[in-house]
């Protein structure tokens, strides 16, 4: 197994069991998509599960991918309102023991969508123009899946993030061509083929 992706672990016992297995089997290249809140802002994890995630799982994973509300929940801090606060929170998350943190800045009110990658070597900014589409359902999940899929092909997380973010930007740019259902639709995962 080259890479593992973990998504929403709602209960403390599940978080602890996954953390124990990661330790036991010394799993490498683990991407944790920190799904913790519904779009409405309602918590999807119990408070105890958030503590277990922070204390037991984060030190076992290679990369976490929080958006700004998720980072705030993990740190029990206010939501970052600008890139300076993103930098502070990204560094604080890295200090919890994971190898890397990708802070996603899509919740900022910028003309571009800035993301910051934090590693022991420093911080790297990645930007892309903000794409105005109603089809954004699953964007974070899609990005973490792309990161997990691309990691074995690239020498480090910075190169992996650059390729995954470029791919996701193209998938968002083509999302309106899908015309799938009503309401918030998906990004165009297959934009490279059709």
What are these regions (language model features)?
Residues 79-86, 152-162:
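Short, charged, surface-exposed loops that flank catalytic or proteolytic processing sites
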Residues 1-59, 63-66:
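Glycine/small-residue-rich loop that forms an oxyanion/phosphate-binding "nest" at active or ligand-binding sites
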Residues 158-194:
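Charged C-terminal helix
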Residues 47-123:
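Conserved phosphate/ATP/ADP-binding segment of small-molecule kinases
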Residues 123-137:
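Short pre-catalytic strand/loop immediately N-terminal to key active-site residues, enriched for Gly-Thr
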Residues 17, 23, 122, 157-159:
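Nucleotide and nucleotide-moiety/phosphate-recognizing core
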Residues 10, 36-38, 70, 105-108, ...:
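Glycine-rich beta-alpha junction loops
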Residues 72-73, 134-157:
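Short, small-residue alpha-helix embedded
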């Amino acid at each position: 197994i080259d890479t593992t992706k973990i998504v929403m672990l709602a209960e403390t016992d599940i978080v602890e069991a996954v953390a124990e297995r990661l330790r036991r089997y010394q799993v490498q290249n683990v991407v944790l998509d920190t799904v913790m809140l519904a779009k409405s802002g309602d918590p999807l994890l119990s408070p105890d599960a958030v503590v277990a995630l922070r204390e037991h799982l984060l030190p076992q994973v290679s990369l976490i991918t929080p958006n700004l509300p998720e980072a705030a929940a993990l740190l029990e801090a206010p939501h970052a309102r600008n890139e300076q606060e993103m930098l502070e929170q990204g560094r604080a998350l890295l200090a919890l023991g994971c190898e890397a943190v990708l802070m996603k800045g899509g919740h900022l009110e910028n003309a571009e969508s800035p993301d910051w990658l934090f590693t022991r070597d420093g911080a790297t900014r990645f930007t892309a123009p903000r794409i105005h589409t109603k089809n954004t359902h699953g964007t974070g999940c899609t990005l973490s899946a792309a990161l997990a899929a691309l990691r074995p092909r690239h020498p480090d997380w910075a190169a992996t993030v650059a390729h995954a973010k470029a791919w996701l930007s193209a998938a968002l740019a083509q999302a309106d061509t899908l015309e799938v259902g009503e309401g918030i639709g998906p990004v165009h995962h297959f934009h490279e083929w059709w």
